[in-house]
Amino acid sequence: MEQAAPSSPLGNVIARIASASKIAGRKAGDVTLIAISKTKPADAILDLIDQGQRVFGENRVQESQEKWPAIRAAHPDVSLHLVGQLQSNKAEEAVALFDCIHSLDRPSLVTALAKAQDKLGKRVPCFIQVNIGAEEQKGGCAVADLPALLAQARDAGIDVIGLMCVPPAGIEPAPFFALLDKLADDNGLTQLSMGMSDDLEIAVQLGATYVRVGSALFGSR
């Protein structure tokens, strides 16, 4: 396994995370980089693996089923996260394939995931996705519904480790990241999945523990 060259896209993103962490008085190791590989071919993924990247994210269950089993057979130390919306009827397939789910956002999905986990005998850590900007077109639970959804998930035996958000596009993301951090604190959660290619520095400075980066690593889709 090689190490990412500082001038490579991966090396550049790692340096950005390290710089933002230093400014915030955090250790670089406090933040995990998720390489978002949706729509990208196996060769592009394998190139990042060869450079040392070990955590990847996908948006769709079906696409992941088509390309990831072979990659993971060759690289069993790679971790795969689902960051896109999850249909309840795909819950069992998601539990079987993924190591973490970032898009738990409604009671029906809690029920489906709990059933799938019991059937497969596998517990998958989950983030609750919060619709932090109250946008009708986006997934995520409403801020006001978070305590009830979290309680339901915990009662169902789901390991909720943190919160995830996608702030509204085109406006300053910092207030939304700060709100997600506060919601996590208020609900006893320590992990925050927030920040992408264009705003990862702000997210890291406001407490992100996972950043989801695609275009800065793979180029525009």
Residue ranges and their predicted role:
Residues M1-T190, M196-D198, V204-L206:
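Conserved alpha/beta-domain cores
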Residues V204-Q205, L217-S220:
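Expand to "…catalyze enediolate/carbanion chemistry for C-C bond making/breaking, isomerization
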Residues T209-Y210:
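Divalent-metal-activated hydrolytic enzyme cores
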